[in-house]
Amino acid sequence: MQTVDLDEVTSRDIRLKVEETMRMKLDKYKDFISRQMMVIMGQMDKASQIFPYLYLGTEWNACDWQWLENNGIKYIVNVTNEVENFFPARLKYLKIRVSDEASTELLKYWNQTNQFIKEAKEKGSSVLVHCKKGISRSSSTVIAFAMKEYGWALSQAIEHVKNKRGCITPNIGFVEQLRTFEGSLDKFKIYLCLTL
């Protein structure tokens, strides 16, 4: 699987790379590829409502005070090393300083992020979970929350979040950690059944 910097890539670059990989000309699909790129880029700019109280988005959503206020967001989970909290005097933050690398240990923070999101929900507030682009770190965190909060299997949680935000792509390391998290949740369910 190839990766590109979405801040630098153009639809032409994508088309040429696909042509190279497929060894065929795609000129007649130029408009289609451009439209699909615009859909993906638009999803990345706009936050996605995953649940009535939970939004998944980017650093741009996190710095848009008007949007935050209009959506009743009083809690923010910032899952980045590189983006600082924009409104610490006005909003409640949970800052998880991690990089988007397969070797990054994100699982150890999920109990903390799940509690924080649940607190926002219980207080009748909305919460934004964001990383830089709303694709990997933050989506993994939201998927982990959905699994814990709703008792969903990993596949169901990924499907739900992907249906709401089509551009999510947790890195392979985070997917492995989500599988581990699913296993620990399953063990806890079995333990509860045995002790009741």
Protein language model features and the residues they cover:
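A phosphate-binding catalytic loop at a beta-strand-loop-alpha-helix junction
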Residues: 126-143
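Cysteine-dependent PTP/DSP-like catalytic domain, specifically the C-terminal lobe
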Residues: 141-143, 147-193
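Conserved beta-strand elements of beta-rich interaction domains across eukaryotes
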Residues: 55, 61-63, 81-84, 98-103, ...
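Helix-loop module immediately N-terminal to the HCX5R catalytic loop
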Residues: 97-127
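Eukaryotic beta-rich interaction modules
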Residues: 32-41, 46-80, 109-114
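Active-site regions of enzymes building and remodeling cell-envelope glycoconjugates
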Residues: 89-99
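Non-catalytic regulatory/accessory regions that flank a structured catalytic core
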Residues: 1-50, 54, 183-196
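Short loop/helix-cap segments at secondary-structure boundaries that form the rim of catalytic
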Residues: 68, 83-91
